[in-house]
């Protein structure tokens, strides 16, 4: 028996049944509406979302950037099938329910292998281990121990553990009716679609085609609106990409840099690129 769940009534609802590697924006929108409806229900204390591991971090990030819920919204998963000798799913679900039942856990979280992660920091870092998720240098913000949630940051630093506000979430938070504003935002996203953003990886032997092919491609997602350049080191990239990237920017394509390094982030300074 789990003490924190002794008086908890659990209701289930299936949003989709799919391999998470095939996650799409349409399913995100349906899920987001279900989360908003649950948040608006005064009888609901928290929400747990069971999700495949391959794109769990992306769904968590999407929800956290869409709005800041006033209740716990917890994503969890399983690395092993239910038929395994020692499945991890049941314990992960129990841990997620304990977090969702805790009123101090308002916001979006990822719970796996006893750890509580921020949606903006967590990533799947191993293809088969049960502790496949990591928040890198920042580490988890909390742990679940025998059904009890323990924050790893003092109460005064709780704000560090919460998702940062985006322009969209700030607009929604400022509304007198969060559900109405958030659903209106979702309606606009469904109507216009999310902007198409592609990744370009800088590597030894890369050619300008890595950029130009993305820009020429049409398809269901429409024209590319942004490129994320996955750089080497502290934001450096192959010189052959300079011209096509400048051409793309001149055409109104937004450019952002990230790094291939597993830890750390790009630091702007005398030795970094502009």
Predicted feature residues:
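Short Gly/Thr/Asp-enriched flexible loops that form oxyanion-binding sites at enzyme active sites
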Residues: 49-71, 237-246
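Internal gly/pro-rich beta-alpha loop/helix module
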Residues: 75-153
């Amino acid at each position: 028996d789990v003490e924190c769940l002794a008086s908890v009534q659990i209701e289930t609802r299936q949003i989709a049944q799919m391999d998470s590697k095939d996650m799409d924006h349409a399913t995100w929108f349906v899920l987001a509406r279900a989360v908003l409806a649950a948040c608006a229900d005064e009888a609901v204390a928290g929400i747990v979302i069971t999700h495949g591991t391959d794109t769990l971090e992306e769904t968590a990030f999407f929800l956290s950037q869409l709005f800041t819920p006033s209740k716990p919204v917890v994503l969890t998963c399983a690395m092993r099938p239910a038929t395994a000798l020692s499945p991890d799913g049941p314990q992960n679900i129990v841990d997620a329910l304990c977090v969702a039942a805790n009123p101090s856990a308002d916001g979006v979280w990822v719970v796996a292998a006893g750890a509580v992660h921020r949606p903006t920091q967590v990533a799947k870092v191993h293809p088969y281990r049960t502790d496949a998720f990591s928040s890198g240098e920042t580490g988890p913000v909390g742990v679940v121990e025998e059904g009890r949630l323990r924050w790893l940051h003092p109460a005064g630093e709780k704000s560090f553990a919460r998702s940062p506000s985006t322009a969209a979430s700030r607009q929604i938070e400022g509304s007198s009716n969060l559900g109405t504003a958030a659903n209106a935002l979702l309606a606009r996203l469904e109507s216009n679609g999310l902007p198409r953003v592609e990744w370009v990886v800088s590597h030894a032997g890369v050619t300008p085609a890595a950029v130009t092919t993305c820009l020429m491609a049409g398809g269901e997602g429409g024209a590319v609106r942004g490129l994320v350049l996955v750089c080497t080191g502290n934001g450096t990239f192959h010189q052959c990409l300079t011209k096509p990237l400048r051409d793309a920017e001149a055409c109104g394509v937004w450019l952002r840099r990230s790094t291939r390094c597993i830890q750390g982030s790009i630091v702007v300074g005398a030795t970094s690129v502009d």
